[in-house]
From Swiss-Prot:
Changing S108R: In MEHMO; uncertain significance. This is Eukaryotic translation initiation factor 2 subunit 3. One of its GO terms (molecular function) is cadherin binding. It comes from Homo sapiens (Human). Residues 134-137 are annotated as: G3. The modification N-acetylalanine is found at A2. PROSITE patterns: G_TR_2.
Length: 472
């Protein structure tokens, strides 16, 4: 906070001002100017096969390179969830033809700027602020992709124009977003600069055949070249026109799913200058405010002398909120938000808090150690290349005592199947998880050394544990 009165943002003066003292959450909408000026209110995932250009598309739209880690740059693949925010503008001059009247910029760009297109007048005005969740396309990173799907409102499905469609991960990702019930999808036919027109047309037919009968049927297919930034403004236009901003709940107690967490202190920092841990995630509902008391569940997990699991929720206070580089006084549901807390930074370093839920004290859901689920298995394994004409391997039924990987919200944890009948199963979780009855979960099984998506389920009920709270 750059001095001044409490509860008023003063960082980035070119953006809309947020004032906590006059905040009325009942009047906020996902398109309120003071919200979208500083933070994204809609999450769009990028999905598709490895090396089809997902990160490049995000970079073309937002100007942010989502690949942050050295080993990712060297191997040119996304390993962690990347993320980037972009503002989408529309020119207020009606004489300007579409799609040129749409433009995208980084999230700290002013909310209005004059046109630079010859022959037009007026200003580019902010219409949407979107957050991109850039998922890895590698088969071994399917769990990360599912964690990202937990916070998506819509998806961009990337298909490279110079390879046949569908590639293995393309179909696996499409199944994953079908489980997550994502209805809004744009298909981007990328690398169009590398193929002849006839090839592009032929692949267009392949894509149509591939998405028929899936959740992506009828989705617009946009030919683009992410590297040359060709047709990117068309993508912006479609994001504005085809993807509705989901209705948001601003009045409930806030709840945030953590998908990243880190320790922001440099080595050798003086003790007095240490900053608390930072949790990054997407708010599902409610509004978080600077200065608010918060609780993180399940918190610190340990075992007592008898080997029983114990959970100790972490209580803390929000010291700062930010969306990329923009300071916030309050954060609304939607895009990815960084929450600066007073939590011991060692608890947050290197994504240790992923899968936890952060929210108002006393308003978070129960902590489960066992789940009873109704489940549905896929008929065939997806994403595995099969020899020649052989059909993909059938998915075997769940067997008692086998270990599956369970994705709940943004948490991936192991689970042992303790009982199974018809379409109901009981799963004993390796790690306790904070969730609710009715939540969707994804199930994966170890097949030939890789975790493969085999089906999904819904939580019917479960065994909960009471959190232990210190009496101090």
């Amino acid at each position: 906070m750059a001095g001044g009165e409490a509860g008023v943002t003063l960082g980035q003066p070119h953006l809309s001002r947020q004032d906590l003292t006059t905040l009325d959450v009942t009047k906020l909408t996902p398109l309120s100017h003071e919200v979208i000026s500083r933070q994204a209110t809609i999450n769009i995932g990028t999905i598709g096969h490895v090396a089809h250009g997902k990160s490049t598309v995000v970079k073309a739209i937002s100007g942010v390179h989502t690949v942050r880690f050295k080993n990712e740059l060297e191997r040119n693949i996304t390993i962690k969830l990347g993320y980037a925010n972009a503002k989408i503008y529309k020119l207020d001059d009606p004489s300007c033809p579409r799609p040129e009247c749409y433009r995208s910029c980084g999230s700290s760009t002013p909310d209005e700027f004059p046109t630079d297109i010859p022959g037009t007048k007026g200003n580019f005005k902010l219409v949407r602020h979107v957050s991109f969740v850039d998922c890895p396309g590698h088969d071994i990173l399917m769990a990360t992709m599912l964690n990202g799907a937990a916070v998506m409102d819509a998806a961009l499905l990337l298909i490279a124009g110079n390879e046949s469609c569908p590639q293995p991960q393309t179909s696996e990702h499409l199944a994953a977003i079908e489980i997550m019930k994502l209805k809004h999808i744009l298909i981007l036919q990328n690398k169009i600069d590398l193929v002849k027109e006839s090839q592009a047309k032929e692949q267009y037919e392949q894509i149509l055949a591939f998405v028929q009968g899936t959740v992506a049927e009828g989705a617009p297919i946009i030919p683009i070249s992410a590297q040359l930034k060709y047709n990117i403004e068309v993508v912006c236009e479609y994001i504005v026109k085809k993807i509705p901003v989901p209705p948001r709940d601003f009045t409930s107690e806030p709840r945030l799913i953590v998908i990243r967490s880190f320790d922001v202190n440099k080595p050798g920092c003086e003790v007095d200058d240490l900053k608390g841990g930072v949790a990054g995630g997407s708010i599902l509902k409610g509004v978080l405010k600077v200065g608010q008391e918060i609780e993180v569940r399940p918190g610190i997990v340990s075992k007592d002398s008898e080997g029983k699991l114990m959970c100790k929720p972490i209580f803390s206070k929000i010291v700062s909120l930010f969306a990329e580089h923009n300071d916030l006084q309050y954060a609304a549901p939607g895009g990815l938000i960084g929450v600066g807390t007073k939590i011991d930074p060692t608890l947050c370093r290197a994504d240790r808090m992923v899968g936890q839920v952060l929210g108002a004290v006393g308003a978070l859901p129960e902590i489960f150690t066992e789940l009873e689920i109704s489940y549905f298995l896929l008929r065939r394994l997806l994403g595995v290349r099969t020899e020649g004409d052989k059909k993909a391997a059938k998915v075997q039924k769940l067997s008692k005592n086998e270990v599956l990987m369970v994705n709940i919200g943004s948490l991936s944890t192991g689970g042992r199947v303790s009982a199974v009948k018809a379409d109901l199963g009981k799963i004993v979780l390796t790690n306790p998880v904070c969730t609710e009855v009715g939540e969707k979960i994804a199930l994966s099984r170890r097949v030939e050394k890789h975790w493969r998506l085999i089906g999904w389920g819904q939580i019917r009920r479960g065994v909960t544990i009471k959190p232990t709270v210190d009496d101090d």
